[in-house]
């Protein structure tokens, strides 16, 4: 008869950002534990609040399934001695399986007999197996962990309670310094310790103590309450998904309310107000029906609506202090001069091993000038790029960015406009940070895109040059994100800038502040980001073939990968790739100094292939270029069918290899076709 299992771990307040992934991890690890221990189940439901992680298993088998395993041992000729008795090898084999030689039988495998034994293991009661379930809790991993009291172990937060129930029976287990029971803790202020009656009564038992254990239910409550406020007040509330997820992991019993602030603060830039409310106070932003910011906010209390007016006043008071700071910095920063702030950047460290921000900007300016030419920017855009590169970090020394660092670039744009800078320059100051997250928004202007590329390129080359190279998951300077941004920007704008040649040219530059180094590592790092950009939807062999193409032009590489994926589902893909692969492999033996000499052709097939290669222009889209190369497949096959490439005559052999080398030099602009798998 099946049963229901409940496991709850009660902890000190968890950081909001770890609650959801930890809840998911607990469910996945328990499912793995049960499967590996042959305990079948129907369903797993997970729960979480800031002070607990829990999981309930429904339809859990009351006993393990029996296990029958066959084990293959040594060959019969080794298992028996000259007298036909079992050898030490056979005896040792069965002993290792906990059996005797009586269990041995011989089975034929591919014409030879081998020792086989069959081991039967009766399933244990679920209750006995579950005594080892604490290994699930011990195996959990967290971004950070801590020690407490005098304990030698560490965990995400101190553990206070452990509840393990099989239906209504409490299992006795020990985890860290806690002995399990059926006592859980209610809401920190509104509830008390409570007894969990059974696995099925878990949510109801906690609800009576003002705890909503199901995160999805808490989220629904928050959204419904906000919608009710919208309807009652005639407003729109920005229900930001990330903020919603954070807030629901800060509360156990949510109650939403709306507060207000003086409308005078609306004269401060909207970004400052939104940052103050959303990022610093975890408030939802309120707008009117036209989308204009209103002097209101919505917050979520961890509790009921008792004395809610006092709660509203307290939150308003805290927010006003933030808004006062914002208003002050907005007013005072406008008194500053951009030139003065830029001059002070010589005293601001970019990194102690690399130099100052001013030096970083100087290098960025040189790189930006080179990129502007490669991207064919207009004269006006080139001028804007140069001016932006001279000043684009000035806002880091403003009071506003010092207080609200999330506004770097955003305030730079606003202050630059107020100072009379060209609109393109001001926009570029904001856009150079983009994209600021995986999948984040990209620069919309060419000037901003070039500045963003230049800034990211110098950052990448500078850190690599001093040996600060990401390893494993460790990337403290966000170089992967910066490089992914480079790849995305190049693809978005369709700039056909050969990255290998560009990086070579940057390494030829000379700066007093820094000498670029570790070029090979930089190129491999960029290739890895292009590989990631192609994504798992592109098979590994296609990604590798494209990454080995002769032209490191990001938009073309990504387009080639897409074209190859589509072509791989067509009938002519396999024969075309196989003929090209054969040509690629043979071309590796060619003498690079040998030029094709048509006077050495001995058959029409040589002449036909050479003419086809000469006429191969690789024009149009990646798909069209691939079609042009694939169209050569019959000509290539005809050449191989009628021509001995590796002829004994050295001149003929070299000439024929040179023909194939010419083919490869053109086709490799798309991909290294011999890296493609057709099996």
From Swiss-Prot:
Keyword Aminoacyl-tRNA synthetase part of the UniProt annotation: yes
Source superkingdom: Bacteria
Localization annotation: Cytoplasm
Catalytic activities: tRNA(Gly) + glycine + ATP = glycyl-tRNA(Gly) + AMP + diphosphate
Entry EC no(s): 6.1.1.14
Annotated GO MF terms: arginine-tRNA ligase activity; ATP binding; glycine-tRNA ligase activity
Stored InterPro entries: DALR_anticod-bd, Gly-tRNA-synth_bsu, Gly-tRNA-synth_heterodimer
SUPFAM superfamilies: HD-domain/PDEase-like (SSF109604)
Subunit structure: Tetramer of two alpha and two beta subunits.
Family assignment from sequence similarity: Belongs to the class-II aminoacyl-tRNA synthetase family.
The protein's name in its UniProt record: Glycine--tRNA ligase beta subunit
Top-level taxonomy: Bacteria, Bacillati, Bacillota, Bacilli, Lactobacillales
């Amino acid at each position: 008869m099946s049963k229901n299992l409940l496991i709850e771990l009660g902890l000190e307040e968890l950081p909001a950002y770890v609650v959801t992934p930890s809840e998911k991890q607990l469910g996945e690890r328990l499912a793995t534990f049960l499967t590996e221990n042959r305990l079948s189940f129907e369903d797993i439901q997970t729960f979480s609040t800031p002070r607990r992680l829990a999981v309930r298993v429904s339809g859990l088998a009351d006993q393990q399934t029996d296990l029958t395993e066959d084990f293959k041992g040594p060959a019969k000729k080794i298992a028996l001695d000259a007298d036909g008795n079992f050898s030490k090898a056979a005896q040792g084999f069965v002993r290792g399986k906990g059996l005797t030689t009586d269990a041995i039988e011989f089975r034929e495998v591919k014409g030879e007999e081998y020792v086989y034994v069959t081991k039967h293991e009766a399933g244990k009661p679920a209750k006995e197996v579950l005594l080892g379930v604490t290994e699930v809790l011990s195996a959990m991993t967290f971004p950070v962990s801590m020690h407490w009291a005098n304990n030698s172990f560490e965990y995400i937060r101190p553990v206070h309670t452990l509840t393990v129930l099989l239906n209504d029976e409490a299992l006795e287990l020990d985890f860290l310094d806690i002995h399990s029971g059926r006592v859980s803790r209610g809401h920190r202020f509104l509830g008390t310790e409570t007894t969990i009656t059974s696995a099925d009564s878990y949510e109801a038992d906690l609800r009576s103590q003002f705890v909503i254990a199901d995160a999805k239910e808490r989220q629904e409550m928050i959204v419904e309450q906000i919608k009710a406020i919208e309807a009652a007040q005639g407003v729109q509330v920005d229900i930001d998904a990330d903020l919603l997820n954070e807030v629901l992991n800060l509360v156990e019993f949510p109650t939403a309310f709306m507060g207000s602030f003086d409308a005078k603060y609306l004269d401060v830039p909207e970004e400052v107000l939104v940052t103050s409310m959303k990022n610093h106070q975890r408030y939802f932003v309120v707008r009117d029906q036209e989308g204009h910011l209103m002097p209101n906010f919505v917050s979520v209390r961890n509790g009921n609506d008792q004395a809610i007016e006092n709660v509203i006043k307290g939150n308003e008071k805290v927010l006003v202090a933030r808004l006062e700071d914002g208003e002050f910095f907005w007013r005072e920063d406008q008194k500053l001069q951009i030139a003065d702030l830029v001059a002070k950047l010589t005293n601001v460290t970019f990194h102690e091993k690399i130099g100052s921000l001013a030096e970083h900007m100087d290098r960025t300016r040189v790189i930006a000038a080179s990129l502007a030419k490669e991207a064919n920017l207009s004269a006006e855009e080139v001028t804007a790029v140069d001016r932006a590169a001279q000043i684009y970090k000035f806002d880091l020394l403003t009071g506003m960015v010092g207080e609200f660092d999330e506004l770097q670039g955003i305030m730079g744009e606003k202050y630059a406009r107020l100072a009379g800078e060209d609109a393109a320059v001001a926009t570029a100051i904001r856009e150079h940070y983009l994209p600021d997250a995986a999948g984040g928004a990209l620069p919309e202007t060419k000037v901003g895109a070039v500045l963003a590329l230049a800034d990211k390129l110098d950052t990448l080359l500078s850190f690599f040059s001093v040996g600060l190279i990401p390893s494993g998951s460790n990337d403290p300077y966000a170089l992967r994100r910066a490089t992914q941004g480079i790849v995305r920007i190049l693809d978005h704008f369709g700039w056909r800038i050969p990255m290998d040649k560009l990086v070579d040219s940057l390494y030829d530059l000379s700066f007093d502040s820094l000498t670029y180094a570790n070029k090979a590592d930089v190129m491999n790092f960029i290739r890895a980001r292009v590989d990631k950009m192609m994504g798992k939807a592109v098979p590994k062999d296609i990604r590798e073939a494209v990454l080995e193409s002769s032209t490191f032009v990001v938009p073309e590489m990504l387009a080639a990968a897409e074209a190859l994926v589509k072509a791989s589902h067509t009938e002519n893909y396999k024969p075309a790739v196989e003929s090209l692969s054969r040509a690629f492999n043979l071309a590796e033996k060619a003498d690079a100094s040998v030029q094709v000499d048509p006077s050495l052709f001995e058959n029409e097939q040589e002449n036909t292939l050479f003419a086809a290669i000469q006429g191969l222009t690789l024009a149009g889209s990646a798909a069209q270029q691939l079609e042009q190369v694939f169209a050569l497949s019959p000509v290539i096959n005809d050449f191989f069918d009628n021509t001995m490439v590796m002829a004994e005559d050295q001149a003929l052999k070299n000439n024929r290899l040179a023909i194939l080398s010419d083919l490869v030099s053109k086709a490799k602009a798309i991909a290294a076709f011999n890296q493609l798998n057709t099996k």
